């Protein structure tokens, strides 16, 4: 959520920045009218409350002097009724204004490339050598079937499309990657490991920005206040909702493994085969709470930690700075990390690393004090996938495939695979 004071003071500049996102600015124009109405109602209410206070004093004085106070009491009651009506109108206006503010996206940072499509995203760096096969690269979905490590057909029978059964070496590879990533982030990078709930309430989904705007993308548990988590970012960020932290606690870093659930609304017909776009998938997420002045330095750190996973797996990748139109609703700045997929001849997203500045913290009321008696300030929150596990499996299958249809296990994963070096059919 954007600071309402900042929105008033820098309205034109903020409107211009949001226009670069390609956003409909109707809500911005409604904000002006609603904010003026709110301030007008507050002013009227304060005047009437002052009149009521004066009337109360006058009535007390009349009674002390044993004079008739009926007329003054009637007048005070009328003022009281007017105050009550204005308070109710003010509550309605503030509720509408708050809902409107919840629907306005974050303000892009000045360093974000201005663009209108994904073609305007800027490649920052390419890392690693792409494999040079002397055979035609096989798509990972065909490799999975040939190696019998994933069962899509039975998952479709049991549940539906965009679900899989991992089996045998496939299940072990998925589990190995989760353990490898969590060990790396905890043991080397100093994160505290979190295993979060897989359901969260509406306040949590609102705090991190999924609600109210993107409710159709979420899986809601019918007749409850619960949603299945679309990412561990939601429960982990909301761990500190409505809390005031101390400065010496910051930065806080959590690494969380969770299953994630997404409806993939709007993705009909896209990536219908393979592991790229599933309704249920595993992911390791990094979440950081930091001081405002440190958040952009921390974004570089976080992105580097996500990259480290790919470097250790020796998977070629590129890092992009996402343009204004491709930032997502909550981010002030975002890097995407894309891994090379030989069968398609393209890079595919495997991680997003974002700085939300105080956008989520303001929604979730996550603050800190620099000193014991200092005024609380909003923290800055960041998160990044490190990594999406199913997509990492897909990348390993494609980049480590052999001419005979087998797949070599990356060396760093072999201790997690019981020493297995090759998956064979």
From Swiss-Prot:
Protein name according to UniProt: Serine--tRNA ligase
Binding site for ATP: 262-264, 349-352
Comment text on domains: Consists of two distinct domains, a catalytic core and a N-terminal extension that is involved in tRNA binding.
Pfam families per record: Seryl_tRNA_N, tRNA-synt_2b
InterPro entries: aa-tRNA-synt_IIb (IPR002314), aa-tRNA-synth_II (IPR006195), aa-tRNA-synth_II/BPL/LPL (IPR045864), Ser-tRNA-ligase_type_1 (IPR002317), Ser-tRNA-synth_1_N (IPR015866), SerRS_1_N_sf (IPR042103), SerRS_core (IPR033729), tRNA-bd_arm (IPR010978)
Catalytic activity: tRNA(Ser) + L-serine + ATP = L-seryl-tRNA(Ser) + AMP + diphosphate + H(+); tRNA(Sec) + L-serine + ATP = L-seryl-tRNA(Sec) + AMP + diphosphate + H(+)
Localization (cell): Cytoplasm
Subunit structure: Homodimer. The tRNA molecule binds across the dimer.
Pathway in which the depicted protein is active: Aminoacyl-tRNA biosynthesis; selenocysteinyl-tRNA(Sec) biosynthesis; L-seryl-tRNA(Sec) from L-serine and tRNA(Sec): step 1/1
Record organism: Exiguobacterium sibiricum (strain DSM 17290 / CCUG 55495 / CIP 109462 / JCM 13490 / 255-15)
Gene designation: serS
């Amino acid at each position: 959520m954007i600071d309402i004071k900042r929105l008033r003071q820098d309205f034109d500049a903020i409107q211009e920045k949001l226009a670069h996102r390609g956003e409909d600015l109707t809500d911005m124009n409604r904000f002006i009218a609603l904010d003026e109405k709110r301030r007008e109602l507050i002013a009227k209410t304060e005047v009437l409350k002052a009149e009521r206070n004066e009337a109360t004093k006058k009535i007390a004085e009349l009674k002390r002097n044993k004079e008739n106070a009926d007329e003054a009491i009637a007048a005070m009651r009328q003022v009281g009724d007017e105050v009550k009506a204005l308070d109710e109108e003010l509550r309605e206006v503030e509720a509408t204004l708050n809902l409107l503010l919840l629907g306005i996206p974050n303000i892009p940072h000045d360093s974000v490339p201005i663009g209108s499509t994904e073609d305007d995203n800027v490649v920052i760096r390419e890392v690693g050598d792409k494999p040079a096969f002397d055979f035609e690269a096989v798509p990972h979905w065909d490799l999975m079937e040939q190696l019998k490590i994933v069962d899509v057909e039975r998952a479709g029978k049991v549940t539906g499309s965009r679900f899989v059964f991992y089996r045998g070496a496939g299940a072990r590879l998925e589990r190995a990657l989760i353990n490898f990533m969590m060990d790396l982030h905890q043991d080397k990078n100093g994160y505290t490991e979190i295993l979060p709930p897989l359901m969260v309430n509406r306040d949590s989904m609102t705090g991190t920005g999924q609600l109210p705007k993107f409710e159709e993308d979420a899986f809601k548990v019918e007749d409850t206040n619960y949603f299945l988590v679309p990412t561990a970012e939601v429960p982990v960020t909301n761990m500190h909702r409505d809390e005031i932290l101390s400065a010496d606690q910051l930065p806080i870093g959590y690494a969380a493994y969770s299953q994630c659930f997404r409806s993939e609304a709007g993705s009909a017909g896209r990536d219908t085969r393979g592991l790229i776009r599933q309704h249920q998938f595993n992911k390791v997420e990094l979440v950081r709470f930091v001081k405002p002045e440190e958040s952009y330095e921390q974004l570089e750190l976080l992105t580097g930690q996500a990259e480290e996973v790919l470097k250790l797996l020796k998977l070629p990748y590129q890092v992009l700075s996402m343009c204004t139109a491709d930032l997502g609703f909550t981010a002030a700045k975002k890097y995407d990390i894309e891994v090379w997929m030989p069968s398609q001849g393209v890079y595919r997203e495997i991680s997003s690393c974002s700085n939300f500045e105080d956008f989520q913290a303001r929604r979730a009321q996550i603050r800190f004090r620099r000193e014991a008696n200092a005024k609380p300030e909003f923290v800055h929150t960041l998160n990044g996938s490190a990594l999406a596990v199913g997509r990492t499996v897909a990348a390993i299958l494609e980049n480590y495939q052999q001419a005979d249809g087998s797949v070599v296990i990356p060396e760093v994963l072999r201790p997690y695979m019981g020493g297995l070096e090759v998956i064979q059919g």
